[in-house]
């Protein structure tokens, strides 16, 4: 009986020691991973990962830190202009966190380039870039851990809000100073001042209703085309399918848009406006009948053609919209 009791005690002690050794080994491994990440971050805010580093530092356990990973294709032969723009915003976000007083090892920013880690793209069944995914400290990434690039855009401020939602880490985005805006404003004011000085004896153009009407019309066209949304969200200019190479200029969702789409809508609205002006002039001007007929036909053509295209764009974004004109 005593012999059996000693065997049981011996087994319990051995299992306890094995558990302690396993725990110590786990803690040592975790400490090494965190130290490695901190060392890399001290040199560069965004850690570049290949397949082996991604598996060891992001996928493998133990891990008590979250990793935001941007999957991209920055090599020139990939011809991904959006990737370069997204990378600039991502670098701004990562540097804002790196040099923040609240910086900790709770979260790291990393990047996997297709040409350096194509096996990672295959592992995750990923066929588009850029893509942002949050790998949480515990558990696997959920659907909300994949950033909705087409909806939110890739502005650093939008990425920071998403990071705060997924990790509860709030980052104040600090952009490097950009002197282009103040410089352009200064040049514009100098131009206006010079023009006013040169024509100081004849300032009737400031009271010309056509000048103010044209200026107001340009402002309305710019605002109704979605330029302010672009300024806030920072969407890509267009989207190129990496598999087919086809470029999309119109976003298929009513919740987002491309910059090119804004230019297209602005052009269509401007053409419809010109058509309406021609129709008005054809009916009220004192020109001869032939010129008025030409203006009338041109105005009708512009309104019908471009309003039809405008409706087709609307139908492409709002699926199920029942109305169309010339184009289905």
From Swiss-Prot:
Coiled-coil region: none
GO terms for biological process, alphabetical: magnesium ion transport; protein N-linked glycosylation via asparagine
Topology in membrane: Multi-pass membrane protein
Spans within the Cytoplasmic topological domain: 199-202, 279-293
Pfam families the record matches: OST3_OST6 (PF04756)
Localization, UniProt: Cell membrane; Endoplasmic reticulum; Endoplasmic reticulum membrane
Extracellular domain ranges by topology: 23-177, 224-257, 315-328
Keyword Glycoprotein: yes
Domain Thioredoxin intervals: 40-168
UniProt keyword list: Cell membrane, Disulfide bond, Endoplasmic reticulum, Glycoprotein, Magnesium, Membrane, Signal, Transmembrane, Transmembrane helix, Transport
Signal sequence interval, chain numbering: 1-22
Main location: membrane
Residue intervals passing through the bilayer: 178-198, 203-223, 258-278, 294-314
Pathway involvement of the protein, from the record: Protein modification; protein glycosylation
Entries under CDD domains matching the protein: PDI_a_family
Gene3D superfamilies associated with the record: Glutaredoxin
GO cellular component, one term: oligosaccharyltransferase complex
Gene knockout outcome: Early developmental arrest.
Assigned protein family: Belongs to the OST3/OST6 family.
Complex formation: Accessory component of the STT3B-containing form of the oligosaccharyltransferase (OST) complex.
Functional description taken from the UniProt entry: Accessory component of the STT3B-containing form of the N-oligosaccharyl transferase (OST) complex which catalyzes the transfer of a high mannose oligosaccharide from a lipid-linked oligosaccharide donor to an asparagine residue within an Asn-X-Ser/Thr consensus motif in nascent polypeptide chains. Involved in N-glycosylation of STT3B-dependent substrates. Specifically required for the glycosylation of a subset of acceptor sites that are near cysteine residues; in this function seems to act redundantly with TUSC3.
Protein name (database record): Dolichyl-diphosphooligosaccharide--protein glycosyltransferase subunit MAGT1
Organism: Danio rerio (Zebrafish)
Gene that produces this protein: magt1
């Amino acid at each position: 009986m005593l012999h059996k009791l000693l065997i049981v005690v011996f087994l319990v002690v051995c299992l306890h020691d094995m558990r302690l050794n396993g725990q110590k080994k786990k803690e040592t491994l975790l400490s090494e991973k965190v130290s490695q990440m901190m060392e890399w971050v001290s040199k560069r805010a965004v850690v570049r990962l290949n397949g082996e580093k991604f598996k060891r530092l992001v996928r493998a356990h133990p891990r008590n830190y979250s990793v935001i990973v941007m999957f991209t294709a920055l090599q020139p032969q990939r011809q991904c202009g959006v990737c370069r723009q997204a990378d600039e915003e991502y670098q701004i976000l990562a540097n804002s966190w790196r040099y923040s007083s609240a910086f900790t090892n709770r979260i790291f920013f990393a990047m996997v380039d297709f040409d350096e880690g194509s096996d990672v793209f295959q592992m995750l069944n990923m066929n588009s870039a850029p893509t942002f995914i949050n790998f949480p400290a515990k558990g696997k990434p959920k659907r909300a851990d994949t950033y909705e690039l087409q909806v939110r855009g890739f502005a650093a401020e939008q990425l920071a809000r998403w990071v705060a939602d997924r990790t509860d880490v709030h980052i104040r985005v600090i952009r490097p100073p950009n002197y282009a805006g103040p410089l352009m404003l200064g040049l514009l004011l100098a131009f206006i001042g010079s023009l006013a000085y040169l024509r100081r004896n004849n300032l009737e153009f400031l009271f010309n209703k056509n000048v103010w009407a044209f200026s107001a019309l340009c402002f309305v066209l710019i605002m109704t085309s979605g330029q302010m949304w672009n300024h806030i969200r920072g969407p890509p200019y267009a989207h190129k399918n990496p598999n087919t190479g086809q470029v999309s200029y119109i976003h298929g969702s009513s919740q987002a848009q491309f910059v090119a789409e804004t230019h297209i809508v602005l052009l269509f609205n401007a053409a419809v406006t010109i058509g309406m002006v021609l129709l008005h002039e054809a009916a009220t001007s004192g020109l001869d009948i032939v010129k008025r007929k030409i203006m009338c036909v041109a105005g009708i053509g512009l309104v019908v053609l471009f309003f039809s295209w405008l409706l087709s764009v609307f139908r492409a974004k709002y699926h199920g919209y029942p109305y169309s004109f010339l184009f289905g």
